[in-house]
């Protein structure tokens, strides 16, 4: 294929849906704030908007095209300001497929192609393209990678080396979520409670003052009648939040499965829109295992990938803030499944050695020095402010106690280690390959130096920036063990 070809005609529909996704929230908020006008006037407004959107989508589609050759593909776009994007197959680092349910009968997918340019978003976005064309692109890309690996084997030195065996000869599914696991993931996702709270605050800003006053009066009257209303409202809020989380999880992670083939992880998921993400092993900088307080009680965990490049940042637009290798899995089978998926890392449960146990006061001293006097002073003027500050201080001390007691590390092999700490009440274990660490930083103060204490920070590439994995208030001998580990030749 060497001549210019337009995208699939369904691109027009996708352009319209994309525009609606951006404008519908403002339309709904406007209706809530001002109410409906005359029926014909409303119909005229919506009809005119739909016509303009359709015309814009058709014009945009007409000015979009692409060409595919054996050595590169070229994307042409732009109505007034013309743009020509030329991408060779050697520069393609990852290809992400997305397929809405209405695209399935037409054998059409959307593509996002990330290159070695290091942009914060995929360099190439193809709204709709036939699957046969995608297979052609993938064939050329694989051929280019094989040729590059054969001609320049030294460039592959930093990649994970996996011997060819029957295990990797075919792309077999290594792990797949059940519907029960998806629902369990939803009801244990504590972030959804904060999300609903933020949505309610946003809606309140755009509601008319009369509505807000009426709701406030009803709430105050109900609270004055007794605490039963508060309990009932709390239960209702939790039920709604869990239902919302379960629906969101089912839409996002339905038919979630992970497979491995030729040094590439493939993650598939999605109910209304199917996502297929291919991740080369050399792009994986590390692995994070997370357990919030609720999941720890239930004995389940989540596994995230730390990726270099910009593709995972695009996930925010899909309400998924990270790339999950295993959204939810029982602790009893966690490491056996990781070993099956990611065989070259030789995953095993780490034996964590604590490095800051008994030093909780160092973690909390500045919070105590600032918040405690403020809380005491506030009680003389605004008791409610003093209460909030005191509760915040107690919360901070509790998390610092947890972190200081459990922060630690484990040396897994000659080239890998695990660092454990707590982010509030969530346990985080970060598995790091020595070759992926960009730099090591040791910091201290004159006071801490006299106590033989310092902080250690390991920097990894994450997205287009850096991830700092920190260990705080470590003894000098523990820091020396880590620095010797990184200085030792493989």
Residue ranges of model-derived segments:
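N-terminal basic, Ser/Thr-rich segments that initiate or prime the first beta/alpha elements at protein or domain
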Residues: 1-490
């Amino acid at each position: 294929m060497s001549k210019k070809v337009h995208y699939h005609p369904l691109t027009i529909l996708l352009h319209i849906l994309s525009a609606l996704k951006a404008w519908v929230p403002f339309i709904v908020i406007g209706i809530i704030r001002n109410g409906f006008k005359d029926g014909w006037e409303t119909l005229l407004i919506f009809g005119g908007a739909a016509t303009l959107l359709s015309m814009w989508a058709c014009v945009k589609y007409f000015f979009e095209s692409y060409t595919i050759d054996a050595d590169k593909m070229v994307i042409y776009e732009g109505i007034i300001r013309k743009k020509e994007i030329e991408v060779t197959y050697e520069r393609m680092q990852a290809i992400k497929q997305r397929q809405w349910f209405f695209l399935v009968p037409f054998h059409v997918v959307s593509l996002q192609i990330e290159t070695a340019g290091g942009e914060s978003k995929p360099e190439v976005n193809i709204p709709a393209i036939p699957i046969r064309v995608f297979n052609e692109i993938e064939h050329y890309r694989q051929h280019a990678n094989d040729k590059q690996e054969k001609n320049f084997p030294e460039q592959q030195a930093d990649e994970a080396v996996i011997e060819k065996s029957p295990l990797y000869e075919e792309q077999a599914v290594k792990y797949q979520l059940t519907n029960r696991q998806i629902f369990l993931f939803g009801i244990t996702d504590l972030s959804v409670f904060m999300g609903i709270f933020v949505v309610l605050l946003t809606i309140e800003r755009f509601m008319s003052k009369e509505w807000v006053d009426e709701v406030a009066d009803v709430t105050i009257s109900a609270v004055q009648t007794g605490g039963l209303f508060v309990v009932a409202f709390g239960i209702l809020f939790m039920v709604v939040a869990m239902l919302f989380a379960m629906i969101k999880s089912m839409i996002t992670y339905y038919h979630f499965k992970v497979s491995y083939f030729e040094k590439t992880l493939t993650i598939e998921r999605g109910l209304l829109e199917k996502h297929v993400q291919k991740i080369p092993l050399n792009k994986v900088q590390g692995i994070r295992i997370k357990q919030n307080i609720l999941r720890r009680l239930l004995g389940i965990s989540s596994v995230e990938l730390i990726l270099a490049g910009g593709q995972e940042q695009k996930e925010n637009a899909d309400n998924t803030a990270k790339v999950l290798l295993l959204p939810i899995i029982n602790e009893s089978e966690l490491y056996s499944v990781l070993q099956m998926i990611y065989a070259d890392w030789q995953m095993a449960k780490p034996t964590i050695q604590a490095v800051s146990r008994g030093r909780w006061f160092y973690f909390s001293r500045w919070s105590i020095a600032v918040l405690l006097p403020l809380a005491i002073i506030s009680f003389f003027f605004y008791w409610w402010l003093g209460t909030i500050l005191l509760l915040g201080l107690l919360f901070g001390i509790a998390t610092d106690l947890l972190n200081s007691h459990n922060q630690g590390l484990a040396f897994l092999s000659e080239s890998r280690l695990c660092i454990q700490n707590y982010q509030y009440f969530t346990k985080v274990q970060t598995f790091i390959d020595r070759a992926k660490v960009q730099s090591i930083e040791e910091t201290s103060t004159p006071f801490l130096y006299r106590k033989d204490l310092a902080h250690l920070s390991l920097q990894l590439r994450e997205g287009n920036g850096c991830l700092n994995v920190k260990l705080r208030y470590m003894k000098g001998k523990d820091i020396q063990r880590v620095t010797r580990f990184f200085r030792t030749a493989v």
